[in-house]
Design a protein with these regions (language model features):
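Glycine/charged-rich beta-loop-alpha catalytic/anionic-binding loops adjacent to active sites
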Residues: 84-92, 238-240
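A glycine-rich, Thr/Ser-enriched phosphate-binding loop motif common to dinucleotide/cofactor-binding enzymes
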Residues: 92-110
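Rossmann-like adenosine-cofactor binding region
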Residues: 169-244
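Adenosine-phosphate binding glycine-rich loop
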Residues: 221-285
């Protein structure tokens, strides 16, 4: 029985990245659909759940992707609600790669040092990766703050994270180097989740900070989000601080993404969202 992966993408075009990883994760065929919404996904789900029976059903799976996490979450919920009884297939959510990227980064930090009770700051924490990273850090028992261009926007995103993960998150302004330096002054952990090619933290803000123990940056394109570290860093020490660059994190992210795809075909009842993906990341880190 061929392993079929259906990519339900909320963007105008299905993701090439997710298609490639789908094949590398073990799918025999990946079929992508664009502009998928909760309103039009019903017939697509029907095609996955009514065509195969018994153990053959586990050879069909759904991946929800696209660049917008809010749209992805709404679509993911609609897909799950369309299942009933034995009429279901395994499904995974990874809009914008946020679940796998954030999970890989935080899992590596958690392996390096205990995070419970530590002060963690997620720079540019209102994006999909930043919000998921904040959630995972909070799950580990860290005291989490996220930054954004305005404190108001950061606090709004913090409320969303709190509701989703049942943790406490604070918001802080981080529009300038000075504001971001102030935000990380007392931090033990810094997770930089900004846009590609945008430096968020100059070396002067962290190099001699005695509080900072761990640094993570998911920006692989120069200038990096954290000045002074390398994209390939995976636990490299800088002045007593352990750093993880985007490529150092990315190796685990890709392995994790592929492993999640493989697990979709192990049963017809798998549901892989933030918590499930993070648990797997910790096993693999």
């Amino acid at each position: 029985m061929k392993k079929l992966l259906f990519l339900f993408d909320t963007d105008e075009m299905p993701s090439v990245f997710d298609t490639v990883v789908g094949y590398d994760g073990g799918a025999d065929r990946v079929t992508g659909y664009a502009n998928v919404t909760p309103d039009n996904v019903g017939a697509l789900v029907d095609g996955t759940i009514y065509t195969r029976g018994g153990k053959d059903k586990q050879s069909t799976a759904i991946f929800v992707g696209g660049g917008n996490m809010a749209k992805g979450e709404a679509l993911f919920e609609k897909v799950k609600k369309s299942f009933f009884g034995p009429f279901r297939v395994s499904v995974m959510l990874d809009s914008n790669g946020s679940n796998t990227t954030a999970a890989a980064g935080v899992a590596l930090l958690a392996k390096a040092k205990p995070l419970k009770g530590k002060k963690a700051v997620v720079l540019a924490g209102t994006g999909p990766v930043g919000m998921r990273a904040a959630g995972f850090l909070g799950m580990e028992g860290a005291d989490v703050t996220i930054t954004s261009r305005t404190k108001e926007r950061a606090e709004e995103a913090a409320k969303v994270i709190e509701k989703r993960f049942g943790i406490k998150v604070s918001g802080a302004a981080g529009a300038t180097d000075e504001e971001r330096a102030a935000a990380v002054k007392d931090a033990n952990i810094v997770y930089s989740a900004g846009a590609i090619g945008v430096q968020l933290l100059p070396k002067s803000a962290w190099e001699n900070n005695p509080n900072i123990e761990l640094l993570a940056d998911v920006n692989a394109q120069p200038p990096l989000g954290v000045e002074g570290i390398e994209a390939t860093d995976k636990g490299k020490e800088y002045n007593g601080k352990l750093a993880f660059g985007a490529l150092g994190i990315g190796g685990l992210k890709l392995k994790l993404h592929r492993e999640c795809i493989a697990k979709l075909f192990e049963s017809s009842e798998g549901v892989y969202d933030a918590e499930e993906i993070y648990a797997l990341a910790k096993e693999m880190a």
